[in-house]
């Protein structure tokens, strides 16, 4: 977990409370922030300063600065509760964004009249670097620039240039002007982050006079270097993910506003930043008590919500919770339940002895799956393990299946196009595995036991309206394989683990007509098996006949 070192005097000043070592060691862990150590260090003036090192959970990037940490602690201790709203003043400052392929997303904001000193400057630099890691993935996803606004002139332009198109003095080289290409070849930061520059295109931010503020994600210019005497700060965030860029900007401007800074909007190609509008979620009172094992009334829940820096009102059995813009960790209602638990007080939870003494044992479904695995291995199959994430092409198109979007769950922000859908079936992934292993000798007999995820509109237990289903699937390929071979293996499995099953003829687009059967148990379809259609075999770029089965375990 990332750690931050905080000056104790500065923390007390921002928290509006005197903090003994005991209070720090007792109370901060109860709000989810671990205290690593309390120590002394000598500052630049030779004076001893008491410092506190905290470990911050990655899901709370707003705690990566003393300002955000103090804001959270004030609420936790009940000093200031509810949403702390930050006013954003309008301005005519504009940023012109030209086409930028490398880092297409950009957001700006101005914070005026910041009460700057050595503490603030150090905290700001540390926050910038911690966010580069926590959200920016070491500047790959986003990069942050903070500038002395008084040294430049609006409007600003964000564009891409060639490596030798311009010269400026980068931070660390106080007098030597360098081109972007020279920076990535000679400058320490340039060498470190040169891999983030693509196709000899260098993102650059310049002011109305053509002066360079920054070459993101590499280095800022010396011209706008922030010092303890700077008071008006211009923040730029550039990156590859729009939501991350905007959320990071919100965290930084709200931290600087804790230093009595005034947030001023900046027009970026017609859109005003920052956007500090509140988010909203609805959560049932009953679900909160059920999850926490408590019997809190709505008033107690609202009090806990307000201590977490949010607001709430009660309406028809639900809490309507208002969430500030810097809280990017509230992704699901379970996060709200955690906030209520933290601010109600973990120390108030009472342990209860179970009424019946029991001993631990394996889950019955897992025991059944392990036994199935042993049987399949005994039948000569090799077990494989695929990812639960797949894609529409593998799951549906190659299997000749026609489905609508409502029939599967798609990942909102997939890491790759190959992993953007939660699988609804295992058999297509086995065919993909056979393709990967087509250079190996035949026969090949493989199986997998794992979870598939399906939509369940009748689900009342979760907010996601989906559930995991445990399935087993197998596939065989060699030149002479046929329906009888897969029927024999499937029957062996069914006789051992399923009772009173029967087969019926089944027309399935992925199988040869007349050579596919569905498995019926208690009047319900629980699986199917048969010979894979030649068209499907060719879709997976395979060459030999394939037979397969798939059965729902639970």
From Swiss-Prot:
Reaction catalysis annotation: tRNA(Phe) + L-phenylalanine + ATP = L-phenylalanyl-tRNA(Phe) + AMP + diphosphate + H(+)
- Origin species: Methanococcus maripaludis (strain C5 / ATCC BAA-1333)
Keywords of this entry? Aminoacyl-tRNA synthetase, ATP-binding, Cytoplasm, Ligase, Magnesium, Metal-binding, Nucleotide-binding, Protein biosynthesis
Designated name of the protein: Phenylalanine--tRNA ligase beta subunit
The uppermost taxa in this organism's lineage are: Archaea, Methanobacteriati, Methanobacteriota, Methanomada group, Methanococci
Q: Which domain of life is it from?
A: Archaea
Cofactor dependence: Mg(2+)
* Domain named B5: residues: 276-351
The GO terms this record gives for MF are: ATP binding; magnesium ion binding; phenylalanine-tRNA ligase activity; RNA binding
